[in-house]
Amino acid sequence: MSETDYSVRSFKGGYDDNITYLVTCMRTRNQFLMDASVPLKQILPFVSKKGLIVLFITHTHGDHTAYMDEYVDAFPNLVVMIYKDSEDKIQTTLKRPVKHGDIVTVGQLSLEVFHTPGHYPDSVCYLLDGILFTGDTLFVGRTGRTVSNGSDTRQLYRSVYDTILDLPGHTIIYPGHDYGPKMTISIDENIAISPLLQAEDEDDFVQRMADYEVERTFEN
């Protein structure tokens, strides 16, 4: 697969510089969304005549599902993909639970599912060719935080270091928020600019995360 087989359009808004991605299979014109973080009116002018067929949810924090009902109402055949343990958290007829290692096909595009708990228990990343949609697991410049109910810093370490950083360094991450100096970045570039991606081991990562939260407190 090459980049000419699909296009990715980014829409920023929502609660806190959230990003929803609209991906189009150029061969079939089928489309999918990554998260429902922005209002339907933002993406509607860019929806093809065949319409949306899949909505992927990276995790069930409210800012990532905020506008899901709008999309489901507008596209009655829209299938919502969500981590298997959270299927009951969303109220829609057409939903498909996914688990680690699943392959999901949209048009002629295939996405691999990675369960990446830590920021939240049902956090999932989706790999499409050379790009990885990371939700709140990994941003440009840092990892996600572990301050909400269900968060686990050690789980996040394993998700990031044993799963994401094990991918080819040229893989481009597409995060769920625009928090960094630019919207997307390669894994290798991200490691170079992020102390949270330079930990020597799990304990070192836990300490770096604790230090990061202290720094945030003083900054605010």
Q: What does each model-found stretch correspond to?
A:
Residues E3, V47, Q108, L165-D166:
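Structural motif
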Residues P121-E219:
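Metallo-beta-lactamase
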Residues L55-T65, F114-P121, Y174-G180:
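Histidine-centered catalytic micro-motifs
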Residues F11, V98, I187:
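Hydrophobic residues at beta-strand termini and immediately following loops
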Residues D16-D17, T28-Q31, A36-E112, A192-L196:
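Active-site HxH/HxHxD metal-binding segment of metal-dependent hydrolases
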Residues S10-F11, Y21-L22, G101-L128:
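Core dinuclear metal-dependent hydrolase active-site scaffold
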